[in-house]
Amino acid sequence: MTLPQAQLDFFTTATSMLEWHYNLERNKPGLLELTGVSQHGRATMSGLNDYDYQSLSFLKSDRTHNLQQMRTVTKSAIPNEILEHFKHIKCHCTMGLFPEIGRAWLTIDSEIYIWTFNQTRDVAYYDGLSHLIVSVGLVKPKPGVFVQDVKYLLVLTTPIEVIVLGVTFGESSYNEMQLMNRPVFVIGTDNVSISVIKGTDDGRIFLGGRDGCLYEIYYQAESSWFGKRCKKINLSQGLVSYMVPSFLKVFSEVDPIEHIEIDNSRKLLYVLTEKGVIEAWDISTSYTTARRLGRITQNDITNQAVSLITTVDPSIFKSVKAICPLSADDADKLHLVAVTQCGVRLFFSTTSLNVKQQFGPAVPCSPGENTGFGQPAVQPPLSPNAEAPKGLYLLHVRLPPGYTPNATTNKPKQVHAAHYTEGTMLMITTQQHEQDLLWSLSSAPSVNFTYLVESTALESLDGVVWGLAEVHEPSTPQRKSPLNSARHARKVALLTNQGTHIIEVLKMVDVLRQILLSCNGPHHEEVKMFFQSQNQREACVTALLLATSDTYRGSDVALWAAQAFMLYGGEPCYQHQKFLNASNRNMANQTLGPNTTNVRERQSMFMSTPMPNSVANSPVGFPGSQFNQPISPIGNMQPPQVAVSNENSPIVFSAKHDGLYMYVSRMLHSVWQMRCVNEQFCSNLSQSECALLLSDLRSLRSFLEVHSVHDISSTTRVSFDNHLDRTNSYNTIMMGNTLLPIPEQRVLSEQAQVEETRSLSALNLFVKHACEVISLWNILNSHSFQLICVQLSPEHQKLLTCSTFRDLLITRSEVCAFLIISLINLYLKDAAGVSEVSKNLRENCPNLYRHEDDVTYKATELLMNAKNCTSATEKEHMLRTTLHMCKEAAPTLPLHSICMQFISADFFEGVIELSAVCASKSDPEEVGVHFYNNGEPADDREGYTCFATRMAYYKEVQLMLDHIYQRVCNKTHVQDKSINPLKGTAKASDAKNGATQTIPKIVAHTLKVKDPLIHITLYEWLLAHDMLKELLDVVEPSLGEFLRRSVSQNVDNVVLIDLLWKYYEKNSHHSQAAHILDNLAMTRSENINLEQRIEYLVRAVMCMRNGNVGSSLSNGIFLKELEDKLDIARVQKSVLAAMTELASDKLEAATAVKELNYALYDITQLYQHFAEPFDLWECQLSILNCSHHNDPLLIESVWGQIINSVVDKPGTTSERCNRLFTKIEILVREYGESGVCFPFAFLIRELEVKACQLRFPEGIVPEKLVSMNLDIELLLEYYSRMISMNERVWANEGNEWHLIQSVIRVVSLLADNAQSIWYRSKRRIVGKAQDIVAGCLNICYQKPDTNRLQHSLKELQSQLQRLLI
């Protein structure tokens, strides 16, 4: 899934801002910084200055409106049926709370009663004990030990035994509580009374004994060879407790344990004894590794506190009455708060404080100074990130209200209970008999300070508090989110002797709601005061919490909160000035540009313990200098200096902008760096947590839809002059003191407005995207998440396991894509309908699961049904329906996937039509076609892009054809193996024949599409698979254009050129075909041999002689040229034949053979380069004849060489004779009518000479020449001339009468065949023969021994004479 570049840019902007606010939230000062411990590197104190405690009145200007810090939710009395049992009480009664299940309990002697404290119903009781109940506890069981119905274990102790009961509930959560009749465990106490019971979240049970020892009940599912199923272990004394008799323990000093508190986040346990001793334990994961970290006595605590504060009565530090663990969410470095009877809070840590390593370049303490107090003497250096607990160290002492110089409240007295929750300390004091007072000390309203400031509130209670615990809401998500913590008030249950009293510890969102309701809207000075007195970014976040709350949706409160957000959220501007004392100002509500730090709006005040003011001495315990402000700035204040702005001043975004980003950052804080899945591919975000996060995201999305980005960024815009006078503090700081002219300030303000609008647009887009991603995760959670992940490829699984939700929301959009694919495939694999899940995805993730995705999977479902359909008509209907759906969603479909499914269903037409539609919709203006038709110009980038896009779509057609071809090949291969196992492969021709049954149909369907580019795709495939016949069967003009372009681009490709002339010839373009054939014949290439060149010329001549070719002059000249080339080519063929005979013996001849095949040569080249150098006499004769060369001597010389070359070859006389006249007969047939190249007279004489020399049979020459159908009259004439010449050559050759013998044979042949002579020429020819015979007789008369010749001649004369009668 590729996001558009503009969207990616927006995401980059939003990500940068979110990361900045995320880090700001992570690095905000915690308790260690607020108490000054990190700045000093030593223990500190506070509570002596007036500003350490404030009431909520500082948030408002109107004193008539009283703001509540806590609110009573419900009050409920103890059920009457339980009170009835008080009449029968004998000796002991105690009460307490089970906040985990929303119930209170009461014991009366040996009976226990349990009821729901918010509605006083569902009363349960247990009376199965015979001894007095000393202590009660409720613990979660260990996983896998009991049946699932047992949700909790009720632990009851008596003086002699510990009883563990199983607790079950009805169908709905924590309703209809039932106690199991029989205990699951019963353990003896060894005569040690158990005063307190506490359990951990993982099911471990701890007991505090009156003997001062800490015990753990270890239990398991079954007994083993080495231990019981359940046993009690004394952690204080270890294994020795098993061997020491209990009566010996009475001689040791006893300090009974009064309280046990557990920090489940750190696996720490704290113990408070009756004498005020505090112990810290590292309980680890098993009793075998549990260890005591440290122990601090009441006297040690007092001494150390007095060393910090010497101006108060030391007695206030004595008698610790309550301990409250600080979880990892509450504080990072501080772990425990202890509260004394006078309300003094003592902050402890289990890690030592090392100045040099932990807090950077602060000045180290002298040896005499305290750096923390505790039992271990050695305090090794600790790492700054995750220090291992090593002891118990007092780091901060905070006095309660009433000790400041101008205190208006009384000091708390007789504190006997305390509870800490999210920055609020609740203390129960006894002011008068039978009535307690509730104190609330909260730091929530004072987030604007760099030191600990708390607001105080008091509320009278109806009776004496027996129990104090936080109410656990069943709907509360397990994973804490800063946003949900700020939105939902914590409820605390107080159990008094009158019943249960549930209060809410109100958050700042509740305070703003009170202000809006009391002011009846946002247009009031008190609302403005709220924004100005708070960190403005935080105030905007608070307003957003109200405006987006589901509780107040559609109400006036939500509307007023949105209006307040718009009115008092400020505007963006440029940071025009460089303040000399900028670090003493507060602009923490604004986000500055790069490399800038934030300053404070409110002036910080002196702290109880002086802190260094120099930047060099500021701590570096956490990143981000925006929170490391000097503690005592008043003495350092100097008059501000005016500075002229420069062009590179960073933008200061408005509080609205930063509030929105902070809101989203806190919303996603708990999942931002969390891995999406664990190693078992289970989602780390549960379905309930996912639903809650999704609800928050959708609420914000709705807010941004109602209040557009432009509205948010420009709501408070007024005329520029008025803008300068606004009471908005930071705008006044940034704009009011500048020396810039008004017009330039206006321009800068508008530029800042534009930048903020862009940033908010990015956030708006991110929120919408986040809604879709979390919606998708919610949908995935509602299915079998592990099964979905199993469907992924190993690469995708690895990517998913490495991804955090930050990656999922920002950079890993492909993860969402393949998860969707896996989900849909899961449905398709199970043959389940995808309509419902597709609809769900489309409604909730319209951009992640687009319309085309929906169509794709519906099409997949239809195609799967079509494959299984037996009815051809119904199958065709399904396929056509699928094609219609896909055409509507084109071109953004996963075309390849759908086409592959079409192919698997043998729906080839669908591939063609869908590809064509995708190409058409992607290029509606046919720019790509125009690019092709214009010859593909190199400078037309847009045209090339469209052309490439179309061709990419048509690639699917080629893949389809490949599939068909391969399928036929495989089928042929299988058939060949079944016939003959020795044949391993199928022949390509067989595959081609099989493919021809299907391919023509596809070709015809493809050619119906009017786009020439799909035709090109088809032609290329046919050409690549050597299906030339099918290609030439195409009659579309686009084929000719394709072939022409291909030839022009591949001038040496003979196959393409060959196809082009065939295309022209087939389509009656004979002239073009002839020209191409001519070019083919003349092409210099090793791929064309001479035989093919001659064939091309022959076809070219035939094309030009076709009747469709016009009789123009140019055509005639071209035809004559072709004929001449053909003649020369035939001569070259003879040269090649002769050269081939020599190639086996001569290397030069072999090279000449290649050259003769490589190209056509002219007649001169053939003679000079081949015929003459290699003595190819017949070829020379052919060349002379073809060129009409008129050089008788040269021609006679060639003939003589031919005759000599034949007779010079070895062999008998008969063989030579036959060989010679066979050659002469061949040459006569070729050149007999050629005139100059056939020197008849010379040929007769040469033959007669050779016959005489070689003693050929008498008269063989005339006999052979006559048999060659040569003109006998001309033959008589040439013999007559030779007789008349009477040369000596015959005598020299050894037969003086050889020529006369030949003449006798010539005349004899004439006389024997006289009937074949034309009667009009008969007398003339016979007369010439008589003259020759007479001449021969005359010669014979002159020579002796010629009687035989004379007799023969005379007989001839008589025979000739008879012919004339």
From Swiss-Prot:
Main location: nucleus
Region called Required for binding to chromatin, residue ranges: 508-986
Listed GO MF terms: chromatin binding; structural constituent of nuclear pore
Disruption phenotype: Embryonic lethal. RNAi-mediated knockdown results in failed nuclear import of phosphorylated Mad in response to activation of the dpp signaling cascade. RNAi-mediated knockdown results in altered karyosome morphology, in the reduction of Nup62 association with the nuclear envelope and its accumulation in the cytoplasm. RNAi-mediated knockdown of Nup62 in combination with Nup154 rescues the phenotype of the Nup62 knockdown restablishing correct kariosome morphology and chromatin detachment from the nuclear envelope.
Single biological process term from Gene Ontology: ovarian nurse cell to oocyte transport
Coiled coil feature spans: none
Domain of life: Eukaryota
Segments for region (Required for binding to Nup93-1 and anchoring to the nuclear pore complex): 1-508
Keyword tags: Chromosome, Cytoplasm, Membrane, mRNA transport, Nuclear pore complex, Nucleus, Protein transport, Translocation, Transport
Membrane topology qualifier: Peripheral membrane protein
Location within or outside the cell: Nucleus, Nuclear pore complex; Chromosome; Nucleus; Nucleus membrane
Entry GO terms, CC: chromosome; cytoplasm; nuclear envelope; nuclear membrane; nuclear periphery; nuclear pore; nuclear pore inner ring; nucleus
Family per similarity comment: Belongs to the non-repetitive/WGA-negative nucleoporin family.
Function: Component of the nuclear pore complex. Has a role in the organization of the inner nuclear membrane proteins at the nuclear envelope. In germ cells, plays a role in the nuclear localization of components of the dpp signaling pathways, such as Medea and phosphorylated Mad. Binds to chromatin, and together with Nup62 and Nup93-1, contributes to karyosome morphology and chromatin organization including attachment to the nuclear envelope in oocytes and nurse cells.
PANTHER family, per the entry: NUCLEAR PORE COMPLEX PROTEIN NUP155
Quaternary structure and partners: Interacts (via N-terminus) with Nup93-1. Interacts with Nup35. Interacts with cup.
Listed name of the protein: Nuclear pore complex protein Nup154
